[in-house]
């Protein structure tokens, strides 16, 4: 389990470089179509899912394995971020954790801290999954009495703002007080979200956020994906 945790950490670190690159590209491509935005974040998603990475001198990812999987057993623990400046700051701190060479029976403190961090990570993942399940259940109950307007469009007195719910068969939910041109405009907007498969990408993005919840850049990436 500790090895899986370290792999997740490494994938998250590698994806962070891509997030920074996407943020820069978003500034350059402000007027690009919406699908370009989804494509850019899709590249980040692939890196968060796939443990394999291709490194090169031109790669945006300096190192695919910043933290060695056997670091907790290393006599002198070090990382390789691919950025010398970062290594020069972090590695001396890690080395200070190592027990003196003449003390052979002392455990590497990382053998203690990594399992603890692993447990904290699992608690975070479990908490977010539980929050998601409860929120989805409450939302389904909220629109349980919704009335069909037409096709996959429903209206409910319990809805205050429009939204799309469902992955396989997405439905558009609207408040009852919406009608006329406003209603048609909102429906067209929500249908555009469905055509772009936002009802797929956003749940996928949140699932990845659940796994990489400890990384602030992933929260920023998810917020920007949902815009």
Regions found by a protein language model. Name each.
Residues 62-63, 161-163, 209:
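Small-residue-rich loop/turn and linker elements
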Residues 29-30, 57, 131-145, 158-161, ...:
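Juxtamembrane transmembrane-helix termini
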Residues 196-227:
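Post-HEXXH active-site segment of zinc metalloproteases
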Residues 22-25, 184, 218:
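Interfacial helix-capping/hinge residues at the ends of transmembrane alpha-helices
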Residues 1-130, 134:
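Hydrophobic membrane-embedded segments
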Residues 34-39, 153-156, 168, 208:
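Hydrophobic transmembrane helical bundles of multi-pass organellar membrane proteins
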Residues 142-199, 223-227:
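Polar-ligand-bearing catalytic/cofactor-coordination segments
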């Amino acid at each position: 389990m500790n090895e899986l945790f370290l792999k997740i950490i490494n994938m998250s670190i590698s994806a962070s470089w891509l997030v920074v690159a996407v943020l820069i590209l978003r500034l350059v491509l402000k007027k690009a179509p919406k699908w370009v935005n989804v494509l850019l974040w899709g590249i980040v998603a692939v890196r968060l899912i796939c443990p394999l990475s291709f490194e090169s001198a031109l790669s945006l990812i300096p190192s695919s394995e910043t933290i060695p999987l056997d670091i907790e057993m290393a006599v002198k623990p070090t990382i390789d971020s691919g950025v010398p400046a970062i290594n020069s700051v972090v590695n001396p701190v890690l080395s200070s954790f190592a027990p003196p060479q003449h003390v052979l029976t002392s455990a590497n403190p990382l053998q203690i801290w990594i399992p603890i961090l692993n447990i904290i990570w699992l608690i975070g993942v479990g908490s977010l999954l539980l929050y998601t399940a409860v929120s989805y259940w409450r939302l389904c109950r909220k629109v349980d009495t919704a009335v069909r307007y037409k096709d996959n469009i429903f209206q409910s007195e319990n809805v205050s703002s429009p939204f799309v719910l469902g992955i396989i068969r997405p439905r558009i939910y609207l408040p009852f007080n919406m009608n006329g041109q406003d209603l048609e405009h909102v429906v067209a907007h929500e249908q555009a979200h469905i055509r772009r498969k936002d009802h797929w990408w956003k749940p996928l993005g949140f699932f990845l956020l659940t796994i990489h919840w400890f990384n602030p850049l992933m929260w920023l990436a998810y917020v920007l994906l949902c815009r």
